[in-house]
A protein has these predicted regions:
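Membrane-proximal transmembrane or re-entrant/amphipathic helices at the cytosolic face
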Residues: 2-5, 9, 405, 419, ...
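Interhelical loop/hinge segments that connect adjacent transmembrane helices in multipass membrane
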Residues: 2-11, 15, 150, 193-238, ...
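N-terminal membrane topogenesis motif
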Residues: 1-34, 67, 72-75, 79-90, ...
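Hydrophobic alpha-helical transmembrane segments
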Residues: 120-127, 155-201, 217-218, 254-256, ...
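Membrane-interface junctions at transmembrane-helix termini in multi-pass inner-membrane proteins
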Residues: 12, 73-82, 132-155, 178, ...
């Protein structure tokens, strides 16, 4: 017996429903994530958050190996037999168990790296999460392969709520950073229970004779790319933790969660829509690049507008969401929002890499961009936590032109100047909006923090409204409206 991906009959309808479920689930996860940042910041100190960030910035690398790319391998396989699925389950479970042991044994070394004894015991308890996640991997992949996006969305939302609930209860007992480990384990355990119950299958004993070499090779290629990305995403935390201690790292980590992680989650559903559409348009030349251009502009008038507001209103936003003891995180939040602007606008390049299937050049570009990021962070760290944030803001501003140049070397007909001007234009508009937000926040300061945030948000929208006087901005908005109409029409046609 074998498991095949859903056939073409009704696939469009299921894809549309799945996209809606995924988007709804993503929206709820973002809300829960923000609520978690706000609530736990009120219950725990910057040092507590810094200690947990020390654990995860190093131990978290095990999560890359835990999956080993085998979940994606199982999802994309044309045919997956029941025995292959069971064998993959046991492989992922064994990897999870091995990594849990490895992280446990590494705990004293991680603590020594940071000079914080408590990190060792925190790491030892957190290691259990890698075992739980390893066991859950193929159950989750099975739901994904079967296009059961509602089940996945429910799992993610419920697990996040369970984790937050456990974390809050433990935090109220006054145990500090242990509450964050409890939140991690609560979410991991809830995920395992839910995906195992919803997947509707149980693994059989492992047996040889079923070919899985192709899955391993696919997985290794995924791991290589994810490793590079992981290093780039965590070098800042390691540098701050080692050089400046848990208090500074805790401040930085909360700002990172608010700016970078939220922007990443906002981009994810857009990427999930853009990549398959661009894959269908590969042979249509001009239409393909028109969609890339308009998609880039669309990001500039949605996610980047929010980031522009955060850049200008970082001080009142930090005070409102995190509280007064986190005031030192405000300039970091502003700088990380700048980094998120350039990362968001460069997302269109990532769509091209994936939709065109040029993952080799993508891996090599990632090596270059991560090297730039590491260099900027190390140089910036000479001026403390704020210097690291400056380095992280500069790095994507230096990397995006390289990405466009890289693509133009691999693919012919790339409208490099048009795409580059789009990024520059959207970045300038973000600066314009941020300036309005900052000025409005200053003027509203006597009225309190909430009034500052509201005034800054309104001022950001006013700034973009004024910018609409420019013909190029009006053309941008017209293009975005046209694409949205086409997508709605396409969705309606596929749902019939």
């Amino acid at each position: 017996m074998s498991d095949r991906p859903a056939g073409s009959d009704g696939l469009g309808r299921r894809a549309v429903r799945g996209a809606a479920a995924t988007s709804a689930g993503q929206g709820l996860r973002i809300v829960i994530q923000l609520a978690s940042v706000v609530i736990m910041a009120r219950l725990l100190t910057p040092t507590d958050h810094g200690l947990f960030a020390m654990v995860m910035s190093i131990a978290g690398i095990a999560e890359v190996f835990r999956d080993f790319g085998l979940s994606q391998a199982a999802v994309q396989a044309p045919v997956l037999t029941k025995q292959q699925r069971s064998n993959l389950f046991w492989i992922n479970s064994a990897i999870g168990a091995a990594l849990a042991v490895l992280v446990f044994l590494s705990s004293w070394g991680i603590a020594a790296l940071y000079g914080e004894e408590e990190v060792a015991s925190l790491t030892q308890l957190a290691s259990v999460a890698f075992l739980l996640n390893g066991v859950a991997t193929q159950f989750r992949a099975s739901l994904n392969r079967s296009l059961r996006f509602h089940a996945l969305a429910i799992t993610d939302v419920v697990a996040a709520l369970v984790g937050l609930g456990v974390g809050v209860v433990v935090a109220l007992t006054g145990v500090g950073a242990w509450a964050l480990v409890a939140q991690l384990l609560g979410a991991s355990f809830a995920t395992l229970v839910l995906v195992a119950a919803l997947a509707g299958w149980l693994p059989t004993a492992p047996r040889s004779g079923e070919p899985i070499g192709g899955f391993i090779r696919f997985g290794w290629n995924m791991v290589a790319t994810q490793m590079v990305t992981y290093v780039g995403n965590n070098v800042d935390s390691v540098v701050i933790g080692v050089r400046f201690g848990p208090d500074q790292l805790g401040l930085y980590n909360r700002a990172y969660q608010l700016a970078m992680n939220t922007a990443n989650q906002l981009r994810a559903p857009i990427t999930n829509v853009a990549v398959p559409i661009l894959s269908r348009l590969q042979a249509e030349g001009a239409k393909y690049w028109d969609f890339v251009r308009v998609g880039q502009v669309g990001l500039g008038y949605t996610i980047v507008v929010v980031l522009a507001f955060v850049i200008g209103a970082a001080v009142p936003v930090t005070a409102l969401l995190l509280g007064p003891r986190w005031a030192a995180a405000a300039p970091v939040l502003s700088l990380l929002a700048v980094a998120a602007v350039f990362q968001t606008l460069n997302s269109a390049s990532y769509w091209v890499y994936i939709s065109k299937g040029i993952t080799g050049p993508l891996f090599r570009y990632n090596l270059v961009s991560v090297s730039i990021k590491v260099a900027c962070i190390l140089i910036g760290s000479q001026w403390g936590m704020l210097g690291v944030a400056v380095g992280l803001a500069i790095a994507p501003a230096l990397s995006w032109p390289i990405s466009l140049f890289w693509i133009s070397r691999v693919i012919g007909g790339v409208p490099t100047r048009t795409l580059a001007w789009g990024i520059v234009r959207m970045a300038l508009l973000a600066g314009w909006g941020a300036a309005f937000a900052y000025a409005a926040g200053l003027l509203a300061a006597p009225l309190g923090v909430l009034a500052q945030v509201i005034a800054a948000a309104v001022a950001t929208l006013v700034a973009y409204g004024i910018a609409a006087i420019l013909p190029v901005v009006r053309r941008d908005l017209g293009d975005v409206r046209t694409v949205l109409r086409l997508l709605r029409r396409d969705r309606t046609n596929r749902d019939r």
